[in-house]
């Protein structure tokens, strides 16, 4: 078996990726989120597959097919709750994974980081089209509002929106193609994950200190397989607690009503994991400006490696940058809260201040803090 593990063309790849992979000896629990995201992806694909067996992508029957899954299909309620709350766990792990990358300077592995940002965008697109499928009130109006943002693109905007809708409004054609997208995208994500891992294994993992760990490495198995297994059990505990005790806590009550194109819900808001970007979108009164800010709020991650000014990789020994990082975290939580509030004072001004702070912290304050810390480290005698 040992020889097969080392010689078989397929098993050899798995062996080098998960068994004998040299890993830094000091990586903390913040390095667990990669494997947790892999687990989330597998859970989402499996539960999604079983849901797709019973779902019908038709405006007349989509809502009732979801109700049928929950009422009549064996453990359908559990599969649906795991899928809906699994998305929340996915994004929770994603945000923590990206946050870890920023804190410890993992973004300096540029290829891995850029593929990661593309992955984030793809997962966001998948979650958006998936939210439309139950065809509840918030599904319908969320799809209408967000796709309508493309009409802000000069000259081709209106044509583009109608092309995506497959008509002159969000209707049967839209639902059918969104279901097709929602089915295919997770497999594209899986392929991108393999590319992400390919680039990561070219360089090896970063570590909390940010210094080269080559002098002190240990095999991935059994040390990190057991550590990842513990993280996985904790995540599954949270997911099952959520799915079994309060499955609708993170959803919107409006989505329990079938879609009514003639009746507008009082407040349109996306799922919690999009609220920070939605708050940035709403904070700009101009439509095109809002759309550009929305895009910039995610794409800004691509320029983070270019904004690295410090001589140290990690924030572990950089208290000023650490403070700014946690201010940025608090800022994102504030934006998430604002995104769920109605468009009225004082929420408008808080959202605008938080949006400006978000871009200011990343583009200006954190690079300046890096330069200042470099200056502080230089001997003055």
Curated annotation (Swiss-Prot):
Entry's localization field: Mitochondrion inner membrane
Keyword Transferase tagged: no
Binding annotation for heme b b566: 97, 196
InterPro entries, sorted: Cyt_b/b6_C, Cyt_b/b6_C_sf, Cyt_b/b6_N, Cytb/b6-like_sf, Cytochrome_b, Cytochrome_b_C_euk/bac, Cytochrome_b_N_euk/bac, Di-haem_cyt_TM
Assigned keywords, A-Z: Electron transport, Heme, Iron, Membrane, Metal-binding, Mitochondrion, Mitochondrion inner membrane, Respiratory chain, Transmembrane, Transmembrane helix, Transport, Ubiquinone
The organism's place on the tree of life at top rank: Eukaryota
GO terms classed as biological process: mitochondrial electron transport, ubiquinol to cytochrome c
Cofactors that this protein relies on: heme b
Cofactor binding, per record: Binds 2 heme b groups non-covalently.
Recorded GO MF terms: metal ion binding; ubiquinol-cytochrome-c reductase activity
Segments crossing the lipid bilayer: 33-53, 77-98, 113-133, 178-198, 226-246, 288-308, 320-340, 347-367
Main location: mitochondrion
Binding annotation for a ubiquinone: 201
GO cellular component: mitochondrial inner membrane; respiratory chain complex III
Residues holding heme b b562: 83, 182
Membrane topology qualifier: Multi-pass membrane protein
Quaternary structure annotation from Swiss-Prot or TrEMBL: The cytochrome bc1 complex contains 11 subunits: 3 respiratory subunits (MT-CYB, CYC1 and UQCRFS1), 2 core proteins (UQCRC1 and UQCRC2) and 6 low-molecular weight proteins (UQCRH/QCR6, UQCRB/QCR7, UQCRQ/QCR8, UQCR10/QCR9, UQCR11/QCR10 and a cleavage product of UQCRFS1). This cytochrome bc1 complex then forms a dimer.
Annotated function: Component of the ubiquinol-cytochrome c reductase complex (complex III or cytochrome b-c1 complex) that is part of the mitochondrial respiratory chain. The b-c1 complex mediates electron transfer from ubiquinol to cytochrome c. Contributes to the generation of a proton gradient across the mitochondrial membrane that is then used for ATP synthesis.
Record-stated family: Belongs to the cytochrome b family.
Note from the entry: Heme 1 (or BL or b562) is low-potential and absorbs at about 562 nm, and heme 2 (or BH or b566) is high-potential and absorbs at about 566 nm.
Name this protein carries in UniProt: Cytochrome b
Source species: Macropus giganteus (Eastern gray kangaroo)
Gene: MT-CYB
């Amino acid at each position: 078996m040992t020889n097969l593990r080392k010689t078989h063309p397929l098993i050899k790849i798995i062996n080098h990726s998960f068994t004998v992979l040299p890993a830094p000896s000091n990586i903390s629990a913040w390095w667990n989120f990669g494997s947790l995201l892999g687990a989330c992806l597998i859970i989402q694909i499996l539960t999604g597959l079983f849901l797709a067996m019973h779902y019908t992508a038709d405006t007349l029957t989509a809502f009732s097919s979801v109700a049928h899954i929950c009422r009549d299909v064996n453990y359908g309620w559990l599969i649906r709750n795991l899928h809906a709350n699994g998305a929340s766990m996915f994004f929770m792990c994603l945000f923590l994974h990206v946050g870890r990358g920023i804190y410890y300077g993992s973004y300096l592995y540029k290829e891995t980081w850029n593929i990661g940002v593309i992955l984030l965008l793809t997962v966001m697109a998948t979650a958006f089209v998936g939210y439309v499928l139950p065809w509840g009130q918030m599904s319908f109006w969320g799809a209408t509002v967000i796709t309508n943002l493309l009409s802000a693109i000069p000259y081709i905007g209106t044509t583009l929106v109608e092309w995506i809708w497959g008509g002159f409004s969000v209707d049967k054609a839209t639902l059918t193609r969104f279901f097709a997208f929602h089915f295919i995208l997770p497999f594209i994500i899986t392929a991108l994950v393999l590319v992400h891992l390919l680039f990561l294994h070219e360089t090896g993992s970063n570590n909390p200190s940010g210094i080269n760990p080559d002098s002190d490495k240990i095999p991935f198995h059994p040390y990190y397989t057991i550590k990842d297994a513990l993280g996985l059990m904790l995540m599954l505990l949270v997911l099952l607690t959520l799915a079994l005790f309060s499955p609708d806590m993170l959803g919107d009550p409006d989505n329990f009503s079938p879609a009514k194109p003639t009746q507008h819900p009082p407040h349109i808001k996306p799922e919690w994991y999009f609220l920070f970007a939605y708050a940035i979108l709403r904070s700009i009164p101009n439509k095109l400006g809002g759309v550009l800010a929305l895009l910039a709020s995610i794409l800004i991650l691509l320029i983070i490696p270019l904004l690295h000014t410090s001589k140290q990789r990690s924030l572990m020994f950089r208290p000023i940058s650490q403070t700014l990082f946690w201010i940025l975290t608090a800022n994102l939580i504030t934006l998430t809260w604002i995104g769920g509030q109605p468009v009225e004072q004082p929420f408008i001004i808080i959202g605008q201040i938080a949006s400006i702070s978000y871009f200011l912290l990343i583009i200006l304050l954190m690079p300046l803090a890096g330069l200042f810390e470099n200056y502080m480290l230089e001997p003055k005698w």
